[in-house]
A protein has these predicted regions:
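Membrane-interfacial loop-to-transmembrane alpha-helix junctions, especially the N-terminal start
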Residues: 46-50, 209-212, 234-258, 303-309
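Transmembrane helical bundles and short interhelical boundary loops of multi-pass, membrane-embedded
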Residues: 50, 77-87, 91-116, 120-125, ...
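Short helix- or helix-capping micro-motifs
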Residues: 1-2, 9, 29, 58, ...
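Short acidic/glycine- and proline-prone juxtamembrane loop motifs at membrane-interface regions
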Residues: 6-19, 64-67
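Hydrophobic, aromatic-rich transmembrane alpha-helices
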Residues: 191-194, 201-245
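Membrane-interface alpha helices of multi-pass inner-membrane proteins
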Residues: 46-65, 263
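Transmembrane alpha-helical segments
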Residues: 23-35, 57, 73-80, 122, ...
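Membrane-interface transmembrane helices that cradle and orient dolichyl/undecaprenyl
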Residues: 27-50, 79-90
Length: 349
């Protein structure tokens, strides 16, 4: 992530996306901690605490930007999938263990109502206090406050659901262009250039081609490994659909669910979109790259490590080449020209 240009640009100029993306990383981290627990054997706090923090950070991400809701869908899929695995495992033992698994799962679901519904709603309502502080006289009771919050949600939803809005923007970029850096977004450039000044600057929002294109290959590898280790079978003597796996490695499904939860909702957004909307998907792309290089087979381990080192060096080289465009650094025209040839980014001559 440190070598990605979009990450540098978005965080350096402190766009709102920086905060929900950070919270999304934390909420998925704590959901991962929950998935790594066997709540039938371990103490209750081992499962409840990760869920509490995951829900807390989900509330913070939604309060920052609605992309946190997309993450919530991914968390729900991961949670119920893990619960299903536990129940399936218990069903192979005896009736008492199955009843215990169902009872504990139900208790966790009740806790999740607090962690993933009530707490996020409270955080979201409280986040409007600074905004409504300027509406003197319009809010005289908690009921008025809630009505104004609902009114704000309706206004935002109507804005985002207006077909074609913003599609005439010169840097409009549909969702399928983001992974291939189809149209970087222009942010700023130097307009007043003193006489004799030979350096230039410009700021664009775009990704490191090595990381973004490498991430697509890594996602394809994760999908292949996920499909390779799964087979679906209905056992006639059981009421459960058994999802069997030749491996207990759930990293691939975790990455794919997280990525698709952040990326696929943008397919349904009818208004104009831009490349920075891909920002929340980047942590899962980078995780996919790391997982793809993590090989346990000693026969291939050295080769993958060498390839990982070469990949990191290539990413660093491209980051240095494109660095001036990512942060607006004043540099010579020759340096900027390299970025201009690689991507559709430019500067005022």
């Amino acid at each position: 992530m440190a070598l990605d240009c979009q990450h540098l640009t978005q965080t350096q100029i402190a766009t709102i996306d920086s905060f929900p993306v950070l919270f999304i990383i934390f909420e998925y981290f704590f959901m991962l901690r929950f998935i790594q627990t066997d709540y039938l054997k371990e103490k209750k706090s081992a499962a409840i605490l990760p869920l509490l923090f995951s829900g807390l950070f989900m509330g913070l991400s939604i309060a920052s930007k609605w992309i946190g809701i997309y993450a919530g869908a991914g968390l729900a899929i991961l949670f119920f999938t893990h619960c299903f695995r536990v129940i399936r495992s218990a069903s192979k033992a005896d009736a008492d263990q199955l009843r215990s698994a169902l009872r504990r799962t139900l208790i966790l679901c009740l806790w999740c109502i607090l962690f993933f519904i009530l707490i996020p709603v409270i955080i979201y309502l409280l986040s409007y206090i600074p905004y409504f502080a300027y509406l003197s006289g319009r809010i005289t009771s908690p009921t008025d406050y809630i009505k104004e919050v609902i009114k704000a949600q309706i206004g935002m939803f109507n804005y985002h659901s207006e077909p074609g809005l913003g599609m005439n923007h010169p840097f409009y970029s549909p969702w399928w262009e983001w992974p291939i850096i189809g149209k970087p977004m222009y942010y700023a450039s130097q307009e007043y250039i003193p006489a004799g000044f030979t350096k230039r600057n410009s700021i664009f929002c775009f990704g490191n081609p090595v990381i973004w294109y490498g991430g697509l290959a890594a996602l394809a590898y994760c999908l292949f490994r996920f499909a390779q280790t799964r087979r679906y079978q209905l056992e006639g003597t059981d009421y459960l659909w058994h999802i069997r796996t030749g491996s207990s490695d759930f990293r691939y499904s975790f990455i794919l669910i997280g990525f698709l939860a952040q990326y696929l909702p943008w397919v349904l957004v009818p208004r104009g979109t831009y490349i920075y909307h891909y920002f929340a998907s980047l942590p899962f792309i980078m995780t996919a790259i790391a997982v793809s290089f993590d090989q346990d087979d000693p026969k291939y381990r050295l080769y993958f490590r060498l390839f990982a080192a070469a990949f990191a060096i290539a990413a660093a080289v491209f980051f240095i080449i494109l660095f001036p465009y990512a942060c607006g650094l004043n540099v010579c025209k020759g340096w900027l020209d390299i970025g201009n040839h690689l991507l559709r980014i430019w500067y005022n001559p």
